[in-house]
Amino acid sequence: MTVTVTDVALPLRVAPNRRHLVDQEGRALLIQGDAPWSLIVNTTYEDAAWFLDQRRAQGFNVVLINLIEHLFAADAPRNLSGDEPFTTPGDFTTPNEAYWAYAERVLDLARARGIIVIAYPSFLGYPDPHYPGYEGQAEGWYDEVVANGPDGCRAYGEYLGRRFGRYENIIWSIGADRNPENARAGLEAMAEGIKSTAPDLLMTAQMMPEHSAAEHYPNAGWLDLLSTYSYAIIPRLLERDWNSTPTRPFFLVESAYENEHNSTMLQIRRAAYWSVLCGGNGHVMGNKPIWMFDPGWQDHVASEGAANLARFGAFFRALPWSTLVPDFDKTLVSDGRGEARGLNQVGAARSDDGRLAIVYIPERRAITVETGVLAGPSATATWFEPGTGQRAPGGTLIVGGPVVFTAPFPEDAVLLLETAASADNGG
């Protein structure tokens, strides 16, 4: 599936309402992301270029990348040329020019294609390493962050900011897969070091699953946006980040990966549609053969998950999605919402002017929509099937009272209600 995506006028900034990321022309960025974590260390330059070309054609505009990889590569932390990231292993103050020059070349590939890179300087790794095939091995740089201390981490951050500050397509991400714990001082110093030499680039932070940077760094001046991370009740976590203070934009950085932990396409679609309709800015998917670039990963680039994300991106970019306000108060969908703490919850939102409403229904069932919250005397209903892209008319209805809808599709469905033509708002 080939998708046309509007180029983003970089650099990005936080919108005045603090809910979205916008480019220099004021267009909101809808994140349709992928997680090729080991792109720098476990692919050739030619393969990296080919991969990014494919993702761009599929509508992906964001990738997650580890700048340094601790475990998940053929010869981590070395790249395929055998270059170590540091001349003294584990010492963040000794960057190896050969390694970082190649990292620049890979980031140049993304920049040339208009792809935003969420760059991780020191992925911490899960505290109880148990990934199949890598059990008991440190997945990330937690111990090294602690050992380098604030001074070494600050120097590393300053180096990264000087080296990559000109890359307007970078968003920095601090930590990942683990809460700060004893690494807090080093991580904060690293973040401050990056900001001191690259002050115009945005920054987020990733915690353990089910935790938020809003809990651990509530008042950090360097924290521009939040990365929601959940394998469980995703809408609950998204609502938490929506309600956190101070207000910051957020996106779903990780959830179920394709071809991992018995995930299904329905799980992947649910995560994506919830990520917008629960107030966020989009979703980053992952795929097991691709994220660490296992042998044969090329055969999985045109996967079903990628096609689902392409349809997700195309659907929302055709609408003024950034005007949507999530229906946490249940004034739009009054019945059929699903279990409050379950995986079958609707994702529902309406525009602030009442001319657009969207409801994602994770399974086939009836829902009741209170049409009185919509503007205008009538609304047009359209059904969209996320798994195929098929559309079906839902009729024209008089706005005013409750209306019961049941999707014509066997699995998940999106109900689109419009009282006026929608303009493109994509990025």
Pin down the residues of each PLM region.
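Short beta-strand segments
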Residues: S173-G175, T204-Q206, S227, F251-E254, ...
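Aromatic- and carboxylate-lined catalytic core of secreted/periplasmic carbohydrate-active enzymes
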Residues: E260, I268-G395, T406-G426
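Active-site mouth of glycoside hydrolases
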Residues: A15-L225, Y229-R236
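Proline-centered flexible-loop/turn and helix-kink motifs
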Residues: G165, P199, P246, R317-P320
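Carboxylate-rich, divalent-cation-coordinating active-site regions
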Residues: L10-V14
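Catalytic-core region of carbohydrate-active enzymes that cleave or remodel glycosidic bonds
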Residues: A220-D294
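C-terminal edge beta-strand
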Residues: M1-V5
